[in-house]
């Protein structure tokens, strides 16, 4: 178990030291075989043949780099699965080499289909392997395992730690910060609601006080007017 922890929890400088790669790039012999098979697909007289073959070779091989670096859980795979995938690719290219030449654009379309299938197969294999290797009962995997990032073979069988998306200090810190920001936002919103409620209640009380004062004022004025009216009537009657 110790060598697995050492491999998966070392800083990324380890990967940089060995050269960050993909599952299909770890075997130089396989790369030469793919290069040879691609060379059989294009007649020598085709303009720009060398440049096109180099580009197709790069896209075909580096595809595994793109897939395995989408997620840390897509980093390792059983060596036998890698071998099976390489065999499948060589068979597909060999089949294509036996077909009649139909032009550059047709060939590029066929190679694109092969790359799409390769992408799908590789991602499914990596995901399936990670699900088995990171299961709760620590399922023991059979055969050697390849770290596609460093091209190193892993001897341990049970997978834990960062590879299985278990507690990562940086992720835990990010979650805590996110939770704090959420609570802070909720506190600000709640405070704003309470302040608005207090303002509305205070305003309502002030309006009631104003209405009472206005009512009292009007009642007094009305009484004064009624008193003046009564006095005038008495004065008028006295004159009669």
From Swiss-Prot:
Keywords: Cell membrane, Membrane, Signal, Transmembrane, Transmembrane helix. Residues 198-240 are cytoplasmic. Its main location: membrane. Residues 1-22 form the signal peptide. It is a single-pass type I membrane protein. InterPro entries: IZUMO. The chain crosses the membrane at residues 177-197. GO terms for molecular function: protein homodimerization activity. One of its GO terms (cellular component) is inner acrosomal membrane. Residues 23-176 are extracellular. It is found in: Cell membrane. It holds the Pfam family IZUMO. The keyword Glycoprotein does not apply. It comes from the Eukaryota. One of its GO terms (biological process) is acrosome assembly. Belongs to the Izumo family. Izumo is the name of a Japanese shrine to marriage. PANTHER family: IZUMO SPERM-EGG FUSION PROTEIN 3. Monomer and homodimer. This is Izumo sperm-egg fusion protein 3. It comes from Bos taurus.
